[in-house]
């Protein structure tokens, strides 16, 4: 009987599913640099003037469902292939589909195994090596490929690499042809064993998404260098040290050092085997910090090539349970930044990246965490230049294991505490540190994100500490900071932070993520910043995150920003990717303006006797000499001209008392002193006159009674008419109608229907994305049916006099099914003279299982859509809420109703304005004037074209259809925003509690 030979398939374990193969034939990681022909070219820092040959552009492309069906390069015929742009991800160019998950792996979880059904992109192009590169080593460099790839040159396999957000470099010299055009083929695999530790909260996107290029290295050349600017204990001098690594034979080398102003500080010549050092002191010595980003230039010449690097003197160390920069415990006012572009996904143009960092700087942000992987290398150059502290994070996250286990320890056993994965973890630490070690902006190395904690993080920590003792190390899920120099938490409340600091006094605490900026929110930022500035062990935090991650999706003539599920991707985490301070196109949202205001580096407050003001400098290093101060007065209908404010010197971290620049006794009505601080000179990130900080000080009492202009009106006394279910009150050309059955009110003036509905008691608003989370209030409000409440009239009484008519409704406002409700009195006073209508509402929440809080307490009024101009005196011009209003100044504003709407990528509650003294809504001919009555006169309002449930039902902006009406809400109170999408609900003082209420509005015609 014949026997069968043993057979197997695929025979050899594929590299992309083999934990023991991370790279094949790649060169060691090195500092990122370009080499130039001479010093002048090197000083441009322009890679186009260096020895550099870009392979970006149009490549041929073939897409397959599995690597086993991908073209075999020896027989491949690319003439029928598609074209694709490099850099770019293939999902944004018509292949496969984008997929968004926050935690879950979108593939079977059997690490390190990867399914053989693994989408694969085959790239091909021709290239020529510049003729003057003959005789040199030619390197092929990929700055970023997701998630793994093989490379062929002229049909011969060169090597393999993985680690999506880390560069890979190959020596292709021996594969090149001098007689013909060369071919380059790259096979990219969507998944690899590395995907298990690249489970970051972002879109899964694939392909060659960063630059590809050639660079020549002479046989004897600089292959790496490390510049260490050391700062002496007194922070008045330092030593610049450089260690240069040569491939090939050593030889003569020269080094030149230029000061921040470009003056030559040192010229040195010696052997490439020597170590260079230069003492810098006196006027030549300048410290680098986020506030003073002074950069020196080092030029290193060897064998006809010059490389250039910007370096900064700064010292990072642990001291007295804090981390210090240049001897001071700085506060992090930070933001997390993913690399994302709404048009191209993971491929971010340089101009877009720089624009982001400029906007961050203009928003008073001083720290960026490169969440959760290394960015494009040009990012660090810009951060050095503009002045940012950077937490540079390794390309590591395996959050998905947390959904498979009950404890973090169990989840860590998959990879983080598994010795089989140690090499993979260390590889990512080495890639990060070696490539970016020369950048002044990097003050902290981060071991990754949400990988739990185990022996592999400990191994990373030990390696980094040996390689680079000049920086500190961060890792949030090392709860006891065994392998980290600082404690780190996510989304803790201020009280939770205080509790931690009471029992952990050996190291400082930062929030590597806080204030989850999802949609309309976060609220309560002020409480965090107050804590950062008052508790020495609390050294700041980084808002999650910089921008929404919507991808522009086109469906015919329709364009919108898509999120998880919009591409048919399963599983997905829907809109959780929309959680930034900017919209998907990087337009600032109100939350960014709020953050910029609250973290501003200068603040002004009145002394207790209100006769002087205290100016506080929150900078860590600089005084206020770079700013011009001015002041002006804001009153109802009046703003004075700005005048210069003379300040004494206010050193960093200190305050000074300054006399008020005016006589308060001369003020006869409510007034606000506005103090502004503007740049004296242009900077790299803002022009002269840019407002860095401002404050408003309330100088005098409550708002004065607003004068309503007289309106000619035929007033023949008040007339009352009643039928079975209606009560009508006529006042000349004005008629108010009361529905005795349902409590509805109408108001008609000269044939114009001013009120189509209301004012009626109303307790609901549209949900925010924070409300909708599992920790938000939506569940409670849904269970208690707050949005389904309607008015039941219990009793109506009225009385008349010559000057007014008082209509008194006793009502119950309650949902169906449930027993709880609001017992209220609505008292309408109609007068013969202005104000024509006064509405008083008082009530209490009664019954079982009532909600603890409600979205709002106020009046809902429906007006014709012609009433589309709004004027108010209060906070503006943008939207603001009770726990997010510091960025909006008290003043007088005017806007069309459509301009009050905030265009969030995901429809939700928006457009509120707080602290109003008065409000006017007009159709051009007729104006309704509204104001509160009582001791706490300010109120809030929204005016728009949608009812709350319209916003609740829509999941994208294009699903909204504006109503032919103006929906006006006048609120006595409303619920804060909080950040419960991930984090705390609104703090107690910002909650709209179900407690007794009593408020009055006056409505007049102007």
Residue ranges and their predicted role:
Residues 92-97, 104-113, 162-164, 173-238, ...:
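An acidic-aromatic loop/edge-strand motif
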Residues 123-125, 166-170, 274-278, 656-660, ...:
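Short strand-edge motifs at loop-to-beta-strand transitions and within beta-strands
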């Amino acid at each position: 009987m014949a026997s069968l030979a043993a057979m197997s398939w695929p025979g050899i374990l594929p590299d992309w599913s083999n934990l023991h193969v991370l790279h094949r034939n790649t060169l060691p990681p090195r500092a990122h640099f370009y080499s130039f022909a001479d010093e002048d070219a090197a000083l441009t820092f322009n890679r186009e003037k260096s020895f550099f040959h870009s392979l970006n552009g149009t490549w041929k492309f073939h897409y397959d469902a599995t690597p086993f069906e991908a073209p075999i390069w020896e027989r491949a015929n690319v003439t029928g292939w598609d074209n694709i742009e490099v850099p770019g991800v293939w999902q944004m160019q018509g292949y496969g589909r984008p997929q968004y998950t926050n935690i879950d792996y979108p593939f079977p979880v059997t690490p390190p195994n990867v399914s053989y059904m693994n989408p694969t992109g085959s790239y091909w192009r021709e290239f020529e090596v510049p003729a003057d590169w003959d005789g040199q080593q030619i390197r092929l460099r990929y700055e970023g490929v997701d998630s793994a790839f093989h490379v062929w040159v002229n049909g011969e396999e060169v090597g393999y690499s993985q680690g999506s957000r880390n560069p890979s470099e190959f020596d292709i010299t021996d594969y090149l042809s001098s007689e013909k055009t060369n071919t380059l083929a790259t096979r990219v695999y969507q998944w690899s064993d590395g995907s298990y530790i690249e489970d970051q909260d972002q879109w899964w996107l694939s392909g060659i998404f960063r630059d590809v290029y050639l660079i020549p290295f002479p046989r004897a050349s600089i292959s790496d260098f490390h510049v260490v600017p050391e700062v002496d204990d007194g922070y008045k001098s330092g030593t610049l040290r450089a260690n240069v690594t040569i491939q090939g034979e050593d030889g003569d080398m020269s080094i030149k050092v230029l000061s921040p102003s470009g003056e030559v500080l040192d010229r040195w010549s010696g052997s490439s085997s020597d170590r260079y050092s230069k003492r810098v002191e006196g006027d030549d010595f300048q410290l680098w910090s986020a506030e003073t980003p002074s950069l020196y230039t080092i030029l290193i010449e060897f064998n006809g090539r010059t490389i250039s690097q910007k370096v900064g003197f700064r010292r990072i160390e642990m001291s007295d349970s804090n981390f210090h920069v240049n001897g001071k415990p700085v506060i992090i006012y930070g933001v997390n930044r993913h690399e994302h572009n709404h048009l191209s996904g993971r491929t971010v143009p340089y101009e877009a990246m720089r624009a982001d960092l400029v906007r961050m700087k203009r928003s008073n942000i001083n720290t960026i965490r490169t969440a959760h992987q290394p960015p494009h290398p040009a990012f660090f150059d810009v951060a050095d230049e503009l002045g940012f502290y950077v937490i540079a994070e390794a390309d590591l996250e395996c959050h998905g294991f947390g959904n498979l286990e009950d404890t973090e320890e169990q989840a860590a056993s998959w990879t983080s505490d598994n010795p089989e994965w140690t090499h993979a973890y260390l590889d990512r630490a080495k890639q990060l540190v070696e490539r970016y070690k020369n950048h002044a902006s990097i003050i902290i190395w981060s071991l990754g994100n949400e990988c739990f904690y185990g022996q592999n993080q400990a191994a990373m920590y030990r390696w980094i500490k040996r390689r680079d003792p000049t920086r500190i190390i961060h890792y949030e899920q090392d709860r006891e900071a065994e392998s980290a120099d600082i404690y780190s938490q996510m989304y803790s409340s201020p009280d939770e932070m205080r509790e931690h600091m009471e029992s952990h006094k050996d190291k400082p605490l930062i929030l590597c993520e806080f204030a989850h900026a999802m949609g309309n929110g976060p609220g309560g930022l002020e409480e965090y910043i107050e804590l950062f500035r008052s508790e020495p062990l609390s050294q700041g935090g980084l808002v999650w995150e910089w921008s929404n991650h919507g991808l522009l999706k086109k469906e015919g003539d329709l364009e919108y920003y898509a999120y998880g599920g919009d591409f048919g991707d399963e599983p997905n985490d829907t809109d959780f990717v929309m959680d930034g301070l900017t919209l998907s196109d990087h337009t600032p949202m109100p939350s960014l303006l709020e953050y910029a205001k609250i973290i501003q580096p200068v603040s002004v407050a009145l002394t207790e006797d209100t006769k002087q003001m205290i100016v506080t400098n929150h900078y860590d290093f600089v005084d206020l000499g770079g700013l011009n101060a001015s002041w002006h007065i804001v009153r109802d209908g009046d703003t004075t001209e700005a005048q210069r404010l003379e300040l004494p010197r206010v050193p960093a971290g200190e305050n000074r008392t300054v006399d008020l620049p005016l006589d308060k006794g001369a003020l006869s009505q409510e007034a606000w002193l506005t103090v502004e601080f503007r740049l004296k000179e242009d900077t790299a990130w803002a022009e002269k006159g840019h407002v860095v900080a401002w404050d408003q000080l309330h100088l005098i009492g409550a708002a004065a009674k607003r004068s309503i202009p007289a309106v000619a009106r035929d007033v023949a006394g008040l007339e009352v008419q009643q039928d079975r279910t209606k009560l009508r009150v006529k006042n000349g050309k004005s008629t108010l109608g009361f529905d005795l059955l349902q409590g509805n009110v109408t108001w008609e003036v000269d044939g114009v229907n001013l009120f189509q509905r209301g004012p009626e008691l109303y307790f609901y608003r549209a949900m925010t994305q924070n409300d909708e989370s599992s920790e938000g209030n939506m569940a409670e409000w849904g269970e208690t049916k707050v949005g389904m409440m309607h008015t039941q009239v219990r009793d109506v009484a009225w009385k008349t006099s010559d000057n007014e008519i008082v209509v008194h409704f006793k009502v119950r406002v309650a949902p169906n099914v449930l027993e709880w409700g609001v017992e209220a009195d609505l008292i309408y006073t109609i007068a013969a003279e202005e104000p024509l209508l006064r509405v008083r509402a008082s009530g209490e929440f009664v019954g079982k299982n009532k909600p603890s809080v409600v979205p709002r307490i106020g009046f809902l009024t429906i007006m014709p859509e012609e009433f589309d101009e709004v004027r108010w005196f209060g906070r503006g011009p943008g939207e603001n809420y009770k726990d997010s209003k510091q960025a909006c100044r008290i003043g007088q504003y005017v806007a069309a109703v459509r301009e009050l709407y905030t265009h969030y990528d995901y429809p939700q509650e928006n457009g509120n304005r707080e602290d109003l003294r008065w409000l006017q809504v007009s159709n051009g001919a007729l104006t309704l004037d509204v104001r509160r009555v009582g001791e706490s006169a300010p109120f809030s309002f929204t005016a728009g074209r949608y009812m709350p449930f319209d916003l609740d039902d829509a999941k994208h902006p294009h699903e909204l259809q504006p109503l032919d009406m103006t929906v006006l809400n006048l609120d006595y109170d409303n619920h804060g925003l909080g950040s419960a999408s991930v984090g705390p609900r609104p703090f107690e003082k910002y909650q709209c509690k179900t407690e007794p209420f009593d408020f009055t509005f006056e409505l007049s015609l102007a």
